[in-house]
């Protein structure tokens, strides 16, 4: 019985893949801090980060509308995403909470210090940055719901469930889910 379950999971349209990995650093203020956080994201992903601007001015925080106060990097492609997730999970000692997985196949977790990631060294000019990581898991045909022309719904049985996402992470990245 177990072999038929794995055969079903490996069948063409049932195969789970990584759609994208999004890494976010919320700096909270503009200027030099955003530049330093940008260097961190470039070291980790080898991509140029995209700045996120403040939606409104908040006097107590010292932010003004339109100022860049955060950075986001989106990585796509199976091999690049797997290599990046592996490095990020090593920083977490390959442990995750079951609450990190949602009902639609997304996984989110945080890192308190970027220097825990293998290959990243501490630079006193940059400092230490924490970040949020979100991973989207999907099956072939997931674009059907996102495309502009002839978009349609993806059935409930075709959406990646929480249990399937946990199994995928255990199998692909040897993660311990608590």
Language model features with spans:
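Ribosome-associated RNA-binding proteins
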Residues: 1-178
